Amino acid sequence: MDVIRNICTALAFTCLSCLVLPAQGGYRVEGIVVDRFGPVIGAAVVEQGTSTGASTGLEGEYALTVSGPSALVEISCIGYASQVFEAALVPQTVILEEDNEFLDEVVVIGYGTVRKDDMTGSVSAIKAEDLNRGALVNTQDMLKGKVAGLLVTPGDGGPGSGARIRIRGSASLNASNDPLIVIDGVPVAQGAGGAMSNPLDLLNPNDIESFSVLKDASSAAIYGSRASNGVILITTKKGIGTAPQVTYSGSVSLQNISRKVPVMSSAQLREFYSKVYPPGTATGVSIASLMGDSDTDWQDLIFRKAFATEHNVSIYGNLNNRMPYRASIAYSGQEGTLRESRYDRGTADISISPSFLDKHLSFDVNLKGVYSYSDYADGSVVGRAAFFNPTIDPYWRNSDGTIDYTTTNGYWNYGNGRGEAFIPNTLVGPSPLSQLYDNISYAHSSRFIGRMAADYKVHGLEALRFNVSAGLDITATDSYNGVRPGSFQACSDTENLAIGQHTKGRHVSRSTLFEAYANYNETWGIHNLDITAGYSWQNNWWSDRDVTYFNLTDEIKLEPGETAESRYLTYRRENYLVSFYGRINYSVDSRYVFTFTARSDGSSKFAKEQRWGFFPSGAFAWNIAREPFMDGLDAVSELKLRLSAGMTGQQDGIGDYVHLARYNLSNDPYHTYDMGAAGYMDMLTPQAYDPLIRWETTVTYNLGMDFGFFKDRLTGSIDAYVRDTKDLLNSVQVPMGSNFGNRLMTNIGSIRNKGIEFSLSGIPLQTERWSVQLGLNGTFQSTVFTKLNPTEDDNYYIETGGLSRGTGGYLCRQMVGYAPYTYYTYMQKYDSDGKPLQNEFVDLDGDGAITEGDRYMTDKSASPAFFYGLNVKVSYGDWDFGFNGHGSEGTWVFNDFASANSTSSLDLNSGSLPNQAQLVRKTGFRAPNSAQQWYSDYFLEDASFFRMDDINAGYTFRNIGKWGTDIRLAAGVQNVFVLTRYSGMDPEVLSENGIDGTMWPRPRTWSFRLNVNF
């Protein structure tokens, strides 16, 4: 590390010496700069109006020659209030005071920044020090429980898995409900695929400076057609100070699953079956023939304790106070708790922001790259392991007890014969170990995102500036999926017996962005006018290709006479978005603030007649605390009322050519025909299409208030909102005889979201040694459909949400007056002890039979009625401690795992013997479940919960050695515990419909972290 430090320091000061030309024969100023903790390293000491400057060293010392004793010397450092002295009056020791309002004062918004006092929209800004701490591999983990109205549902236990992010609920039926994510001014392409399926995977969490979450139309309308689901602006760290600074952070972690699927052990299973199916009965005899004499915990065999590590190195500084720079590299490696799974990621980030012409001309260059590699394990093996026969030895054995690798690679499976004569029982499928070890699936991805911007402040008219930028986002992913030769899966392939086949895929995506805008910002007395007008052009392009090979020879799998080009087509698509936008901010004495925003978008996803959409908004803010009648109320430091209304649009998630008739060539070899010497392929009839399909549009109304008391020791905000989305994209029935498919995607429907959200931050204790900070946020929300078809038929519905058992049925309905994915179930009957009566339900229509007419619409769905976050930070001297948690109330989950495994009834025709869930002891079900039992409201459970996301503690050693190094040692736990009444694996179900078929359990992580600042 010293070598890196020395090299970086030498390079930086070499450049500095080339750029700084100190005055000759002038007045010499020298001294030290400190804060309340000690020396301030890297503070800028500059003679105002010149390029003459210096930076403080390791002990805070500096020396500078200025033009004369009356020259003005400015001493500044990021995060501190600047101080200016005449050269002759500079004290020997300059004490800098922390500028607590530095990061609070300016908030990043679309295409610029705004002073917090002048902000009219509903925007939540999170600073770096307020983000969740700990061993963070995923960027979304930093946001959990931090922002009112922002719901982050983590993915499953797979390493590198993404998350579902929703801002103020879901407002679309078939289009995307994901927010727009903008990283350093570049909108991030969603769904890059493969190992880059997580759109935030591009970022190293240690590189992030702040988040801004734009929630209402006033703040988000500047992004127009992509902003209906809100916008998350991510700003990465830039160079600060002057002298080069080097930081290192690293961690090691141990992960284990917090719980297993509750099933019986082999001893419990033998006892249970002997009671339910006595040995003398026919079923008992069949069970005995399928039982082994082993005691196998299949879940223990597929899971493991997993290790993870991460390392981050960065260097930053500011050459001559004119070129802030920062560079970082990082690596993270994470084993999965499922064996055979792993995730590796390397990132690099470079940021340079030089300025010229007395800072009138500036450039901003941001380059980010990431490489990731994923070994995937089949998550469905969790359920298979839970219910696979625990009395069976997991391996084929030779007579001497060694493993017989000639049969399905040594892993025991249901079937007949051994070795090459083995015939698999395909009704059962592979054993857990075969499924885990003999399936091969991996992907590696490379991604680059870059942006270059030039900003010119007009000489003589400094209020006017022009900004031009270009951005590029490129992803390339190579994937592989197949099975090992000799495996159960390969033996099941009748066409390529014991050889099988595998598929290689290639996915490439590219997003190109060009933007230009002008900004005019002028202040006349108590009046301030800020005008922005701009143009944006974006092209998104994708290419996908999959090729199938023989496993052993790696030869392309072709039919006689075929070519690879004819069999394996490359699918390409693209779209364009052209936009004009503008914003006007006008304030009077920072008391009355008006904002008007408009954006016009033209999208190639729609026909010419519907291509352009216009999205306006307006907002007003009244800073009541600045009114004269508030004078003397010293307890009130902030009180601001906000009103806004506006329109945003939605074009994502609907395909690129939905307004066109799309004909497709079949690549099925059985759909080719020979006529003489010529061969012909099927041309598939297009699906029905609507040439006048148009934008989904959302109108949002927001009323909010920001407040602060006791010099901002207590701050907070409260917002009430209503979002009306119309022209929902919905799939409707096509009349018979149209010669199209039977469904049509068109604009029919509307949905309303409304809610109240609040956030509170308090500092109940602040002394020289002690600091206690508390944060709490919460959101009450509801969502209902207000229209779903053109006839205003309130009985119209859309079925969705299939179960793992049952055939042809759906559990959820979309219906006017109800929330999305409302459960549609049978009402279970119970005995006098409260136990469910198997296959008995309430006859709601009174016809004497249990039919489809006895199902009813519940008032329950997976959308929480209230969700919240809790954050606590405590410090004493150099010690720090904190924890973060989040939870929800009024969330209902259908336990599909319980529904599918609620009876001990057996079907032995498949030739296999399953394990039993512990649940069967509770239900007492012995007969086969009826079709209605799978859909019983008995399995509908309250999944309200509180999750302790992380607990961490650390100690900082300050100003160590000749480099003045700060070292922080910390330890923490993530996913500490969950408080819930839900009986399933985890109350946070990733599927939006709330159907829980069990999943790869989210791990608990124990970590140790080291941070070093040179």
What residue ranges belong to the model's regions?
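Extracytoplasmic gating/loop element in the C-terminal half of outer-membrane beta-barrel translocons
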Residues: 285-289, 429, 433, 603, ...
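Short aromatic-centered micro-motifs
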Residues: 45, 75, 181, 586, ...
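Short, small/polar-rich motifs associated with maturation and membrane association
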Residues: 1-7, 15, 19-370, 378, ...
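Extracellular/periplasmic, surface-exposed regions of secreted and cell-surface proteins
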Residues: 131, 178, 306-309, 345-346, ...
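Short Gly/aromatic-enriched secondary-structure transition segments
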Residues: 262-264, 483-485, 547-550, 791, ...
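Helical mechanochemical/support elements of P-loop NTPase systems and associated helical scaffolds
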Residues: 135, 139, 204-207, 701, ...
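Glycine-rich, aromatic-lined ligand/substrate-binding cores of catalytic
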Residues: 861-894
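Conserved small-residue
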Residues: 247-293, 386, 657, 746, ...
